[in-house]
Structures are given as C-alpha cells and as structure tokens.
C-alpha cells in the first residue's frame, strides 16, 4: 500500500492540474438511478450520485474545485436533498458537510501515508483543491447496512492490502470498490507481489457471487458483469503463467502472446519484476 501512495503522488506531481471537463453517465436501476461522474482529473477519479424519488446520496465526491463545481451543479439540477455524503476511499466534496465513512477510515485518513498523500496534493494543486473535510463524521461498522429512501448500502470490509475502506453493496444491484475492474493489463501498482494477484482473484469471484449487475470504482467508474468475468479469466491466466514460467522475461513474453494487443503492455516488465522478486 505504501508503494501505491508514493506512485500516485509522483504521477500527480508530473501530470499537473487538468481543468474540469468531466462527463456524467446515468444508469437506471429500476427503483433508483446511478449517476457516475468521470472527473478527468490527474488521478483518474470517479464520483457517484445515487438518486431515489426522494433524495440523493453521494459517494467519493470530487477533490478539485473545478470538478466539485461541475458535480455539485449537476446534483442541484436533480432538485433533491442530499441525505448522505459517503467518503469511502477518497476525500472530497463540501469540506463542512457531514459525512459517513467505513469504520476506521476517519483515523486512517488523518494520519500516516494517507495524510501525507493529501498534504502532497495540497502542495501540488494549491488553491485548485478543496479544503479537506472537517465536518462531523459518522462511521459505519463492517457488516452493517445504511438505508436511504428504500435503497440499502451494505458495508463489507475491503480486500486486504489496499485502502482499509469498504466494499459497499448498493440496493443489492451495485458493488462499489476502490477501483473498478478493467480490460487492461495489470500494473506494477496494482500487483506489488504475487499475493496481490491472489487477493484480486478472490475479490472478483466474490463480485460475481454477489448477484450485482453493475460494478463501480472510485477509479474506473462503472462496468458491467462481462468486464468482471474477463478480468477474472485474465488474472487466472497471470496466476497460471507465474507458476509455469521460470523467469520474468518468459512470463512477459507468454502473457503478451496470450493477450496480443491488450492495453498496458508497457507495464508488464514492472509487473514481472514485482512478481518474481
């Protein structure tokens, strides 16, 4: 996890600030709607609004002021009260608003590596970044369920090795994690060692067993079940080749052969170095 923080901070420092030109995507889940906001910020963040007939819930609202302006203006146009602001993995949103967080995240975000990362963002983004949240914070214990206007939010403990946030099952139809499954090769940041691949496979299997229709992440946005199935098959291939190939170079060659043209080949040497160390 320490490597994740360092890599993310370095990425942001080199990329600089991108002015907000985000986009929204809406999914109708019958008794509620999910609004996914792709920020186009340097971190590749996504933020979410769950809309019911009588209110709204935000999840991991944007960190940068331009994005927050787009996001909050959009929310106002829905003409409904925001009942809860959930901070799961990412700080952001109205700094003075009351927030709901998974157990332990209030402390985790205020000290150590997370706090250092946020202070680094403050130095890099300056006045383009919102103040950090200072409003009252209520924590939801793992295994407990929040109910808002008939939509349930079940908080389950996130996989080991990443942020100690929650996997949130929304309305028994949507599964929220830190990063959504995707179609690209894994990166050195997501696979710091072989155990991380095992953890990812286990979590994808849980995702498919959850009965959810949509899988969302504060990085990556919203994807369907087919993307989850494809990533599971891919990671099982990674796991098999890791046992089969004796060297890092042979592993990279075999993975490229198995998935010709797959996005992210440039990351494979670092992935192999991590997995074979």
Which residue stretches match the model-derived regions?
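Active-site metal-binding motif and surrounding structural segment of the metallo-beta-lactamase
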Residues: 54-55, 65-106, 210
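Accessory terminal helices/loops
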Residues: 108-109, 116-118, 209-214, 221-277
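Active-site-proximal beta-strand/loop segments in catalytic clefts of secreted hydrolases
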Residues: 37-40, 52-53, 59-62, 86-91, ...
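Conserved beta-strand hairpin/beta-sheet module of binuclear metal-dependent hydrolase folds
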Residues: 21-77, 166-179
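Sec-dependent N-terminal signal peptides
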Residues: 4-14
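Metallo-beta-lactamase
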Residues: 23-29, 63-64, 105-230, 237
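Sec/Tat signal peptide C-region and signal peptidase I cleavage site
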Residues: 16-20
């Amino acid at each position: 996890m320490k490597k994740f923080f360092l890599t993310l901070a370095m990425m942001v420092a080199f990329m600089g600030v991108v002015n907000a030109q985000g986009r929204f995507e809406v999914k109708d889940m019958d008794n509620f709607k999910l609004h996914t906001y792709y920020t186009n910020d340097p971190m590749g963040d996504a933020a979410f609004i769950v809309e019911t007939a009588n209110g709204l819930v935000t999840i991991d609202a944007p960190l940068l002021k331009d994005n927050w302006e787009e996001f909050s203006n959009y929310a106002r146009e829905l003409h409904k009260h925001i009942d809860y602001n959930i901070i799961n993995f990412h700080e952001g949103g109205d700094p003075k608003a009351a927030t709901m967080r998974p157990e332990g995240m209030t402390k985790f975000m205020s000290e150590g590596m997370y706090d250092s990362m946020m202070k680094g963002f403050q130095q890099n983004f300056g006045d383009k970044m919102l103040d950090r949240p200072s409003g009252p914070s209520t924590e939801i214990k793992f295994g407990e369920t929040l109910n808002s206007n008939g939509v349930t939010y079940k908080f389950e403990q996130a996989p080991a090795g990443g942020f100690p946030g929650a996997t949130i099952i929304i309305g028994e139809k949507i599964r929220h994690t830190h990063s959504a499954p995707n179609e690209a090769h894994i990166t050195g940041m997501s696979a710091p060692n072989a155990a991380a691949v095992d953890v990812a496979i286990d979590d994808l299997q849980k995702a498919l067993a959850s009965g959810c229709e949509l899988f969302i992440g504060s990085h990556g946005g919203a994807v369907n079940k087919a993307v989850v199935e494809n990533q599971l098959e891919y990671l099982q291939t990674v796991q098999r080749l890791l046992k089969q190939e004796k060297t890092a170079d042979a592993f990279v060659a075999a993975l490229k052969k198995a998935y010709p043209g797959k996005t992210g080949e440039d990351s494979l040497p670092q992935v192999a170095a991590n997995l074979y160390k």
